[in-house]
Amino acid sequence: MVQKYIKIHSDDLVAVALCPLEKGTVCNVDGQEVTLIEDIAQGHKFALKDIKKDQPIIKYGYPIGIAKEDIQQGSWIHTHNMKTGLNDLLTYSYHRNVQELEPSEKRTFMGYRRKNGKVGVRNEIWIIPTVGCMNNVATSIERQAQKYVKGNVEAICTFTHPYGCSQMGDDQENTRQILADLIQHPNAGGVLVLGLGCENSNIDVLKNYLNDYDSDRVKFLVAQEHEDEIQDSLGIIADLADVVSQDKREEIDASELIIGMKCGGSDGLSGISANPAVGGFSDLLISKGGTTILTEVPEMFGAETILMDRCENEALFNETVDLINNFKEYFKSHNQTIYENPSPGNKKGGISTLEDKSLGCTQKSGKAPVVGVLQYGQCVKNKGLNLLSAPGNDLVAATALAASGAHIVLFTTGRGTPFASPVPTVKISSNSRLYSNKKNWIDFNCGGLVEGVSLDTLSNDLFEYVLSVASGKKVKSEEAGFHDMAIFKQGVTL
């Protein structure tokens, strides 16, 4: 039976339309009849009782904003009659609320074991320019090197970016660290680092950011030192292909998987279907000893105390407070309003305030304890749920997840996007209409919730799908040949 509306939490003052509802529709919610006094679009909210001006509006069991006026039962609730209730910097206190997950049966996937013990889910050759001046050269090399994509050489990809020179301070450090992280990513069976020669982030400097690397698989070329950098690079790619082609997939325990979690183009159903399904997936993977990473810090604002209270100890709580407040200070340093969110697309889909968006966004974290807090560019160390410092921008955040060690990124969306990151990026739709309309973008559909599919079923099905991707199944963006990256920029350009 098709479910037409949902009250998410017993304390909620609103319900969410799971399909378009017409004015005059009588909704029976917890034994109470609510007659809609206006049309309600899919993903949008309506009042379950009269709400007074300045009264908090409750959804997910938490306030998502404040009524700007008296709101009548059955009314549409959105930006016209509610506003954010959030302030700037806050003082937080630790109220430990940790739920340990019971271990579950082991599962395996077919991956690549690297010489340093790390695990990859792809066996690709990556071309990484140190500086934006080399982007076109790198792209030309990639295009001409496609003849080497065969057998166990799964792809040859270039990751271009506009940085590597004319940068100072944190920006320069961020660029170097992200490039170093990608150079050492286990999804790359081989890497050509392509430098110009005179840039700030030149190859000699970058080598200081690398750990012990396999010299048979990581090669360097400085273009200013070669008469024909393209032909010489193609020779290096040919040698790398000979090495990479010898790699074989083997059975690996799922406890070694690291999965990034991100949302973008969210709608009013994202926090009800897709994000909770990813949260269930995260708990399932962690119960098997695996690791997940949650980022997009600005979209934690308004829901941060939930994550803080799930920190395993007070030291992690303090790190999470710094994670949140440092990002708020970043906004303030640029004279930007901290809560200038959600986007026009979010609002069209039914998300009204940042609290509304954040409480839906953090559903991806499931119920597991927070075991680690990572700075931008820092690789994950602790198995379990980790928080990562990165902005909400889709490509910047997804690249940060990959740089921190994610083998795969799970990306939920209610509006849709074709983008790809350096690692397989699984697009998960919150509604079936998007899945039907954009099958060339979307890999997994959570819209079945409206048709009666349970969240547990969706999470279990998603887990099986992720194991298949980890074992080599290509996602839609890979089939289209899409790979991309972006680096977080904060400062001046010389």
Language-model features: where?
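Metallocofactor- and cofactor-centric catalytic cores in central/energy metabolism, strongly enriched
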Residues: 1-408, 415-418, 423-494
